[in-house]
Amino acid sequence: MNLPNSLTILRIFFVPLLVVVLLTQKPNWDFWGLSVHFEVWGVLILLAAAATDAADGYFARKRSEITTLGILLDPIADKLLISAAFISLVAMGLVPAWMVVIIIGREFIVMGLRNIASAEGLVIPASPLGKTKLFLQVLAGCIVIYSARHVGIKLLALVLLWLVVISAVVSAVHYFLVFWSQVDDRFKQHQRAPLVLEQKKNPQDVPTP
């Protein structure tokens, strides 16, 4: 297995570890008088998982190791990580459930649109909005996790959560518009095709001079 795919699988392994740390709120260790509580471990795990997302794409392009397995696993790993993190935060009472429904619902809507497009031979390109959304999700996740024992940053956490929700909605609308535009173009092409064939079968008589 190549390096990019190994990093993607590592990201998947981070998911249950993050969930256990958040839901058990452990470990809470003291190192030579320095307390390192569960929220620090949660942030570190989420950042490490996000780092593998950036690294696998970089190495796949750098080493020309883009594979079908990697194309399949990478978005699945991202969705597992974000879904598990935010569902755990709902269970901890740190994030409203309706926000997470929108965040995760967006992921499945876009995935569905991509699958339909792929089945029809269409391609929905990655959007800068999608990349911004993922960055905001990781940032908001880290701040919300850290706010579990640091109430002074709860307002910042709420602001970031709203930005995540807004970016999720905007990017979902963008993907739908791109999808609809491509479907509409395909439909118009199918409508024009019989006319073109009919013209070829029955060419107009060209008058001779």
Label each region the model flagged.
Residues 1-209:
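Alpha-helical transmembrane bundles and membrane-interface segments of multipass inner-membrane proteins
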